[in-house]
Amino acid sequence: MQAPFPKNSANLTHLDGQGQAQMVDVSDKAQTIRQAVAAAQVRMLPATLEAIQAGNTPKGDVLATARLAGIMAAKQTANLIPLCHPLPLQKVAVEITPDPQLPGYQIQATVKTKAETGVEMEALTAVSIAALTLYDMAKALEKSMQIESIRLVSKTGGKSGDYFPPAP
Protein backbone atom coordinates (compact mmCIF):
# COMPACT_ATOMS: atom_id res chain seq x y z
CA MET A 1 0.00 0.00 0.00
CA GLN A 2 1.35 3.39 -1.01
CA ALA A 3 1.30 6.33 1.40
CA PRO A 4 -1.09 9.15 0.43
CA PHE A 5 0.40 11.85 -1.77
CA PRO A 6 0.92 15.03 0.28
CA LYS A 7 -1.41 17.83 -0.82
CA ASN A 8 1.26 20.51 -0.26
CA SER A 9 3.90 18.66 -2.26
CA ALA A 10 4.63 21.48 -4.72
CA ASN A 11 7.63 22.55 -2.63
CA LEU A 12 8.86 19.03 -1.83
CA THR A 13 11.80 18.77 -4.22
CA HIS A 14 12.44 15.07 -3.52
CA LEU A 15 9.02 14.07 -4.91
CA ASP A 16 7.99 13.93 -8.55
CA GLY A 17 4.50 14.78 -9.87
CA GLN A 18 3.17 11.38 -8.79
CA GLY A 19 4.62 11.60 -5.29
CA GLN A 20 7.48 9.21 -6.01
CA ALA A 21 10.91 9.81 -4.51
CA GLN A 22 13.43 11.34 -6.88
CA MET A 23 16.92 12.73 -6.70
CA VAL A 24 16.76 16.51 -7.02
CA ASP A 25 18.27 18.02 -10.17
CA VAL A 26 20.91 20.48 -8.96
CA SER A 27 22.57 21.01 -12.35
CA ASP A 28 21.32 24.61 -12.62
CA LYS A 29 22.58 25.59 -9.17
CA ALA A 30 25.84 27.46 -8.71
CA GLN A 31 28.72 25.82 -6.91
CA THR A 32 29.25 27.64 -3.63
CA ILE A 33 31.22 26.99 -0.46
CA ARG A 34 29.09 25.01 1.97
CA GLN A 35 29.88 23.75 5.43
CA ALA A 36 27.98 21.72 8.00
CA VAL A 37 28.75 20.78 11.57
CA ALA A 38 27.02 17.88 13.31
CA ALA A 39 27.34 16.44 16.79
CA ALA A 40 26.56 13.31 18.79
CA GLN A 41 27.45 11.92 22.16
CA VAL A 42 28.15 8.50 23.58
CA ARG A 43 27.23 8.04 27.23
CA MET A 44 29.05 5.35 29.23
CA LEU A 45 30.06 4.36 32.73
CA PRO A 46 32.95 6.33 34.25
CA ALA A 47 35.06 3.14 34.32
CA THR A 48 34.59 2.69 30.56
CA LEU A 49 35.61 6.29 29.90
CA GLU A 50 38.69 5.80 32.08
CA ALA A 51 39.66 2.57 30.29
CA ILE A 52 39.36 4.20 26.85
CA GLN A 53 41.36 7.23 28.01
CA ALA A 54 44.07 4.93 29.40
CA GLY A 55 44.17 2.81 26.23
CA ASN A 56 43.06 -0.32 28.13
CA THR A 57 40.72 -1.73 25.51
CA PRO A 58 40.76 -5.15 23.85
CA LYS A 59 40.32 -3.85 20.28
CA GLY A 60 43.02 -1.18 20.24
CA ASP A 61 42.84 2.59 19.78
CA VAL A 62 39.12 3.30 20.14
CA LEU A 63 39.23 7.02 19.40
CA ALA A 64 41.53 6.90 16.36
CA THR A 65 39.44 4.12 14.84
CA ALA A 66 36.17 5.97 15.49
CA ARG A 67 37.58 9.22 14.06
CA LEU A 68 38.74 7.50 10.87
CA ALA A 69 35.42 5.66 10.55
CA GLY A 70 33.59 9.00 10.74
CA ILE A 71 35.78 10.48 8.00
CA MET A 72 35.30 7.43 5.79
CA ALA A 73 31.54 7.48 6.40
CA ALA A 74 31.19 11.10 5.30
CA LYS A 75 32.78 10.12 1.97
CA GLN A 76 30.28 7.25 1.56
CA THR A 77 27.08 9.16 2.37
CA ALA A 78 25.67 9.04 -1.17
CA ASN A 79 26.08 5.24 -1.11
CA LEU A 80 24.21 4.95 2.19
CA ILE A 81 21.36 7.46 1.88
CA PRO A 82 19.40 6.95 -1.35
CA LEU A 83 18.67 10.52 -2.48
CA CYS A 84 21.96 12.16 -1.46
CA HIS A 85 24.19 13.47 -4.23
CA PRO A 86 27.79 12.26 -4.41
CA LEU A 87 29.83 15.32 -3.49
CA PRO A 88 33.49 16.28 -3.69
CA LEU A 89 34.42 16.89 -0.07
CA GLN A 90 37.21 19.38 0.55
CA LYS A 91 37.27 18.85 4.33
CA VAL A 92 36.08 16.25 6.81
CA ALA A 93 37.22 16.69 10.40
CA VAL A 94 35.96 14.51 13.25
CA GLU A 95 36.74 15.50 16.83
CA ILE A 96 36.07 13.15 19.75
CA THR A 97 36.37 14.79 23.15
CA PRO A 98 36.07 13.15 26.56
CA ASP A 99 33.29 14.55 28.74
CA PRO A 100 33.60 13.35 32.35
CA GLN A 101 30.35 15.16 33.24
CA LEU A 102 28.35 13.02 30.78
CA PRO A 103 30.27 10.64 31.35
CA GLY A 104 31.34 9.71 27.84
CA TYR A 105 32.43 11.40 24.64
CA GLN A 106 31.25 14.36 22.59
CA ILE A 107 31.67 13.83 18.85
CA GLN A 108 31.69 16.66 16.32
CA ALA A 109 32.15 16.53 12.55
CA THR A 110 32.82 19.45 10.24
CA VAL A 111 32.37 18.87 6.51
CA LYS A 112 33.09 21.39 3.76
CA THR A 113 32.60 21.39 0.00
CA LYS A 114 32.32 23.64 -3.01
CA ALA A 115 29.27 22.18 -4.71
CA GLU A 116 25.66 22.68 -5.79
CA THR A 117 24.16 21.20 -2.63
CA GLY A 118 24.95 21.08 1.07
CA VAL A 119 26.85 18.64 3.26
CA GLU A 120 24.49 18.31 6.23
CA MET A 121 23.93 14.60 5.62
CA GLU A 122 27.67 13.99 5.31
CA ALA A 123 28.29 15.62 8.69
CA LEU A 124 25.42 13.70 10.30
CA THR A 125 26.65 10.44 8.78
CA ALA A 126 30.16 11.11 10.06
CA VAL A 127 29.09 11.58 13.69
CA SER A 128 26.67 8.64 13.52
CA ILE A 129 29.28 6.19 12.25
CA ALA A 130 31.96 7.56 14.58
CA ALA A 131 29.59 6.96 17.51
CA LEU A 132 28.71 3.46 16.28
CA THR A 133 32.39 2.64 15.86
CA LEU A 134 33.22 3.93 19.32
CA TYR A 135 30.48 1.64 20.65
CA ASP A 136 31.80 -1.32 18.66
CA MET A 137 35.37 -0.77 19.81
CA ALA A 138 34.37 -0.52 23.49
CA LYS A 139 31.43 -2.93 23.76
CA ALA A 140 33.63 -5.59 25.36
CA LEU A 141 33.98 -3.17 28.28
CA GLU A 142 30.34 -2.08 28.42
CA LYS A 143 27.29 -3.01 26.38
CA SER A 144 25.01 -0.43 28.02
CA MET A 145 26.63 2.61 26.33
CA GLN A 146 24.10 4.98 24.76
CA ILE A 147 24.42 6.95 21.53
CA GLU A 148 22.52 10.21 21.99
CA SER A 149 21.71 13.62 20.56
CA ILE A 150 22.71 13.18 16.93
CA ARG A 151 21.99 16.62 15.52
CA LEU A 152 22.91 19.34 13.05
CA VAL A 153 24.82 22.07 14.87
CA SER A 154 25.13 24.49 11.95
CA LYS A 155 25.18 24.84 8.20
CA THR A 156 26.45 27.68 6.08
CA GLY A 157 26.20 28.51 2.40
CA GLY A 158 23.69 27.70 -0.26
CA LYS A 159 20.34 29.07 -1.37
CA SER A 160 18.57 28.48 1.95
CA GLY A 161 21.23 30.44 3.82
CA ASP A 162 22.87 29.79 7.14
CA TYR A 163 21.29 27.71 9.88
CA PHE A 164 22.18 27.83 13.56
CA PRO A 165 19.57 26.00 15.65
CA PRO A 166 18.99 26.88 19.28
CA ALA A 167 21.17 24.94 21.72
CA PRO A 168 19.59 21.68 22.93
Curated annotation (Swiss-Prot):
InterPro entries: MoaC (IPR023045), MoaC_bact/euk (IPR047594), MoaC_sf (IPR036522), MoCo_biosynth_MoaA/MoaC (IPR050105), Mopterin_CF_biosynth-C_dom (IPR002820)
GO biological process: Mo-molybdopterin cofactor biosynthetic process
Active site (record annotation): 136
Regions that span the bilayer: none
This protein's pathway: Cofactor biosynthesis; molybdopterin biosynthesis
Catalytic activity: (8S)-3',8-cyclo-7,8-dihydroguanosine 5'-triphosphate = cyclic pyranopterin phosphate + diphosphate
A Gene Ontology molecular function term of the record: cyclic pyranopterin monophosphate synthase activity
Coiled coil: none
Enzyme class (EC, first level): lyase
Keyword Ubl conjugation: no
Residues at which substrate binds: 83-85, 121-122
Tree of life domain: Bacteria
Keywords associated with the record: Lyase, Molybdenum cofactor biosynthesis
Enzyme Commission number: 4.6.1.17
Family to which the UniProt record says this protein belongs: Belongs to the MoaC family.
Known role: Catalyzes the conversion of (8S)-3',8-cyclo-7,8-dihydroguanosine 5'-triphosphate to cyclic pyranopterin monophosphate (cPMP).
Subunit structure: Homohexamer; trimer of dimers.
The name this protein goes by in its record: Cyclic pyranopterin monophosphate synthase
Organism: Nostoc sp. (strain PCC 7120 / SAG 25.82 / UTEX 2576)
Gene designation per UniProt: moaC
